[in-house]
């Protein structure tokens, strides 16, 4: 008779193997894309645009890479559409170094919609991916028209972005948040408790948390560097101050490799994003909360939702606290849940009739 535990072990091994192969395949493709982009010769106008957004606009490296990828794809499509390359050249090998202002200015609205149709049908782009490409095109043509002043018309002014479905953020309820905090245990209890407390109270990004230095905290003020290297001040409440204070009492002082870092790994280095993501998942599992796709970033959603619902925080204040450049990003936290809908109906003056 087959041992059931052996069957379970074999089933898990198969799942882990499939997951591992997916990761390897993803990073193999991504590495090829990045290495090819680095070796590619950009047209001068694209380099000028990327330099402007990198230095003057202080966009993050990931944003600059996204702009470059989207515009390289667009230039290749444009050359193919204009018949400027032979049919035997693979699409991803089309040279774009000769793209000039005349070609760029010749683009009209029909070309732009043809491009979006191409990335939908040939590249299987989802609505969010197409929306990003629209944003990249708008930024590029706005730069050429308003800043560089090298084109006489902007074809993206009438370009519509794909309609995106509204997704409510995944977040922990107040009771689940308390359950998570109360379940934290282990050899790094104080550190992990401080980390999760900051997530739940301040709505930090993971990248912001791992980069906190000791001197970034002055009494009840925490200074963080967010997206686009933008600095913002977050005021710490009593729970955060106490959690940090308790952690600092046990924070290692000898053999520390990064003395500036607030949060340290077991190897006495600055804690990594991967470690933070792991420890959050570990404590979620310990609190029996792992089945709802919660993660470290979902704790940021939780903080925003709880502040909006229980703290009477207006949307503009929440935008500043979270470090959003656009208030439309913050508006996803103005959702209501079933209990609020039920409460609204029960407040109807006719509900007792």
Swiss-Prot record:
Active site positions: 205, 227, 297, 300, 324, 333
Coiled-coil segments on the chain, per record: none
One Pfam family per UniProt: Phage_integrase
Top-rank taxon: Bacteria
SUPFAM superfamilies: DNA breaking-rejoining enzymes
Domain Core-binding (CB): 40-145
One GO cellular component, as annotated: cytoplasm
Localization of this protein: Cytoplasm
Cross-referenced PROSITE patterns: CB (PS51900), TYR_RECOMBINASE (PS51898)
Listed InterPro entries: CB, DNA_brk_join_enz, Integrase-like_cat_sf, Integrase_catalytic, Integrase_recombinase_N, Integrase_SAM-like_N, Tyrosine_recombinase_XerCD
Keywords from the UniProt entry: Cell cycle, Cell division, Chromosome partition, Cytoplasm, DNA integration, DNA recombination, DNA-binding
GO biological-process terms attached to the record: cell division; chromosome segregation; DNA integration; DNA recombination
Chief location of this protein within or outside the cell: cytoplasm
Domain Tyr recombinase: 167-346
Record GO terms (molecular function): DNA binding
Function: Site-specific tyrosine recombinase, which acts by catalyzing the cutting and rejoining of the recombining DNA molecules.
Family listed: Belongs to the 'phage' integrase family.
Name of this chain's protein: Tyrosine recombinase XerC
Originating organism: Caldanaerobacter subterraneus subsp. tengcongensis (strain DSM 15242 / JCM 11007 / NBRC 100824 / MB4) (Thermoanaerobacter tengcongensis)
Gene: xerC
């Amino acid at each position: 008779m087959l041992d059931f535990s052996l069957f379970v072990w074999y089933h898990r091994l198969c799942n882990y193997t499939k997951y591992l192969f997916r990761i390897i395949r993803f990073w193999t493709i991504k590495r090829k894309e990045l290495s090819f982009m680095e070796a590619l010769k950009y047209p001068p106008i694209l380099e000028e645009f990327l330099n402007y957004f990198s230095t003057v606009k202080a966009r993050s490296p990931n944003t600059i890479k996204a702009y470059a990828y989207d515009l390289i794809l667009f230039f290749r499509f444009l050359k193919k559409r204009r018949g400027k390359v032979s049919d035997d050249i693979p699409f991803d090998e089309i040279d774009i170094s000769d793209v000039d202002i005349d070609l760029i200015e010749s683009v009209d609205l029909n070309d732009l919609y043809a491009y979006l149709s191409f990335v939908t049908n040939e590249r299987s782009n989802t609505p969010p991916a197409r929306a990003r490409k629209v944003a990249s095109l708008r930024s590029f043509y706005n730069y050429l028209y308003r800043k560089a002043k090298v084109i006489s018309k902007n074809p993206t002014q009438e370009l519509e972005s794909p309609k995106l479905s509204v997704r409510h953020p995944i977040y922990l309820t107040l009771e689940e948040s308390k359950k998570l905090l109360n379940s934290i245990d282990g050899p790094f209890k104080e550190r992990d408790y401080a980390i999760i407390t900051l997530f739940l109270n301040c709505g930090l990004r993971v990248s912001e948390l791992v980069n906190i230095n000791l001197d970034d905290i002055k009494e009840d003020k925490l200074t963080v560097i967010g997206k686009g290297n933008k600095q913002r001040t977050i005021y710490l409440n009593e729970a955060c101050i106490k959690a940090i204070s308790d952690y600092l009492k046990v924070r290692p002082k000898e053999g520390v490799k990064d003395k500036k870092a607030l949060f340290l790994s077991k190897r006495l280095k600055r804690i990594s994003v991967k470690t933070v993501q792991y420890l959050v998942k570990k404590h979620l599992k310990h609190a029996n909360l792992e089945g709802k796709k919660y993660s470290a970033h979902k704790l940021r959603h939780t903080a925003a939702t709880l502040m909006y619902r229980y703290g009477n925080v207006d949307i503009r204040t929440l935008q500043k606290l979270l470090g959003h450049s656009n208030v439309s990003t913050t508006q996803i936290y103005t959702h209501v849940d079933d209990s609020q809908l039920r409460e609204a109906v029960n407040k109807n003056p006719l509900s007792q009739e």
